[in-house]
Amino acid sequence: MPVIKVRENESFDVALRRFKRSCEKAGILAEVRSREFYEKPTTIRKRENATRAKRHAKRVARENARNTRLY
């Protein structure tokens, strides 16, 4: 849990912005969204494999684009 100490003469908006940023860095909202509904382990594995495959395809496409000549 991110803890923010409000500095002297610091406005509420600035302190709230700092708190939101620290929550974002800690990944709290992403964790809450992922745990909102139960997801079967097979579904989790399937989703992770799909993201891995997409990332790999993107990397290969970048490599191929770098190796092709533009003339």
From Swiss-Prot:
Q: What high-level taxonomic lineage is stated for the organism?
A: Bacteria, Pseudomonadati, Pseudomonadota, Gammaproteobacteria, Pasteurellales
Instruction: Locate the region Disordered.
Output: 47-71
List the gene name. rpsU
Family matches, as InterPro entries: Ribosomal_bS21, Ribosomal_bS21_CS, Ribosomal_bS21_sf
GO-annotated molecular function: structural constituent of ribosome
GO annotations of cellular component type: ribonucleoprotein complex; ribosome
- Chain intervals with Basic and acidic residues compositional bias: 60-71
Which keywords does UniProt give here? Ribonucleoprotein, Ribosomal protein
Look up keyword Nucleotide-binding and say if it applies: no
Q: Name one Pfam family in it.
A: Ribosomal_S21
Family from the record: Belongs to the bacterial ribosomal protein bS21 family.
- Its recorded name reads Small ribosomal subunit protein bS21
Protein's GO biological process: translation
Q: Does the keyword Methyltransferase apply?
A: no
